[in-house]
Design a protein with these regions (language model features):
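Partner-binding and oligomerization surfaces adjacent to conserved cores of proteins
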Residues: 1-208
Length: 208
């Protein structure tokens, strides 16, 4: 069913840290490419008089070329699929943590509707709607932090997809390295076939 899986697109170094530490790492959004998005989070931080606002983004959408090319580009890109309910059970109740789907709004709508401060971390412009983003934020009024780790069970990972641009010759060695991490020997890991799929090609060959 839709919404049962949360996809986290990132890079191999971040994945090695995630699996080794068994944590999700929320970071400062100031480095994000979408400056409108990071500005809303800055405004939320200022209006709530917070010392820290950090975030981590997922997608509820199926695998797409757009997600790979924007969020996990290159041969070191990866996509971790999480079982939504199991991940939520792990983070629910964590101090300072909020999470929800992102709302996408037209500029014309925003001009006629005054935004609420509490919604700023989860509001983006309509052109980003294809991301189908689900977001976790961490906030603190007393502690200034540059990152925040949240523990999660490895059992909440459904599968890991390696980059479709990862050379075939490197695929098995990367899998072996990941499965050597404590607790990761049974993880389902495969290289994405998004840009080169044998079944799709065969259908072309069998066309009449």
């Amino acid at each position: 069913m839709a919404g049962e899986i949360l996809r986290r697109y990132t890079q191999l170094p971040a994945l090695f840290y995630m699996l080794s530490e068994k944590t999700l790492t929320l970071l400062d959004p100031n480095s994000w490419d979408d400056k409108n998005d990071s500005y809303f989070l800055e405004q939320y931080k200022a209006k709530r008089r917070l010392k820290t606002v950090l975030a981590l983004c997922f997608s509820t959408a199926p695998e797409t070329y757009h997600h790979w090319s924007i969020f996990a580009n290159g041969s070191a890109g990866i996509c971790v699929q999480f079982k939504r309910d199991e991940l939520l059970a792990a983070i629910k109740g964590c101090d300072g943590v909020r999470y929800r789907n992102v709302d996408y709004m037209l500029l014309t709508t925003a001009k006629t509707k005054r935004l609420r401060t509490k919604d700023l971390p989860f509001t983006k412009r309509r052109p980003y709607i294809s991301e189908e983003e689900w977001r976790i934020i961490y906030e603190s009024a007393t502690h200034e932090k540059h990152s925040q780790d949240i523990a999660f069970p490895l059992a909440s990972i459904s599968r890991i997809s390696l980059s479709p641009w990862l050379p075939e010759a490197l695929k098995n060695r990367v899998k072996e390295s990941l499965r050597k991490i404590e607790g990761c020997s049974g993880l389902e890991i495969s290289r994405s076939t998004l840009i080169s799929n044998e079944q799709w090609r065969k259908m072309g060959e069998q066309a009449v």
